[in-house]
């Protein structure tokens, strides 16, 4: 019985690890945020298989966009999802914000586990809404996890 339980736990851990392996790590997202440069974003993300898709503009400003296992329409709406975990990384043109959007709930939970392992306080802020988790750590950037709507249901900011 113990062997069966051990086998099941091993399978769960390996599936969770696989679910996260093709998404940018939290440490890399923080590195991009701290350097605040397009060059660092390109170096880190393109080495991991992300493809640069250009600059999108909305009411909040301009963002540089990279995608993995998916494509974007000319309006930067996600389309053509491929095998594996689809994700999109946006770097605000001013370098003040990095967004990581994922489609898979397991990959989203994996990002949260990485933040927890880095020693962040995983508490909710007093004014946070349902589906928003604000994580803090001294002398480190604040990380926010948000549950949104399709086509990009999960976001780490």
Region locations from a protein language model:
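Long, charged/polar, surface-exposed segments that mediate recognition or autoinhibition
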Residues: 76-130
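A charged, solvent-exposed segment within the mature domains of Sec-exported extracytoplasmic proteins
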Residues: 110-157
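N-terminal leader/targeting segments
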Residues: 20-86
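Short, ordered beta-strand-loop transition motifs
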Residues: 56-61, 71-72, 91-95, 124-130, ...
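Bacterial Sec-dependent N-terminal signal peptides
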Residues: 1-24
């Amino acid at each position: 019985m113990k062997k069966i339980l051990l086998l099941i736990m091993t399978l769960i851990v390996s599936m969770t690890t696989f679910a996260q392996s093709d998404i940018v790590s939290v440490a890399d997202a923080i590195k991009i945020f701290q350097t605040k440069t397009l060059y660092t974003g390109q170096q880190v993300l393109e080495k991991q298989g992300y493809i640069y898709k250009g600059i999108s503009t909305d009411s909040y400003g301009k963002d540089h966009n990279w995608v993995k296992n998916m494509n974007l329409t000319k309006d930067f709406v996600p389309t053509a999802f491929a095998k594996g975990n689809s994700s999109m990384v946006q770097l605000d043109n001013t370098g003040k914000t990095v967004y990581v959007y994922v489609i898979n709930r397991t990959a989203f939970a994996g990002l949260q586990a990485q933040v927890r392992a880095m020693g962040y306080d995983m508490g909710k802020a007093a004014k946070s809404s349902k589906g928003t988790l604000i994580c803090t750590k001294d002398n480190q950037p604040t990380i926010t996890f948000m549950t949104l709507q399709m086509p990009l249901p999960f976001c780490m900011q």
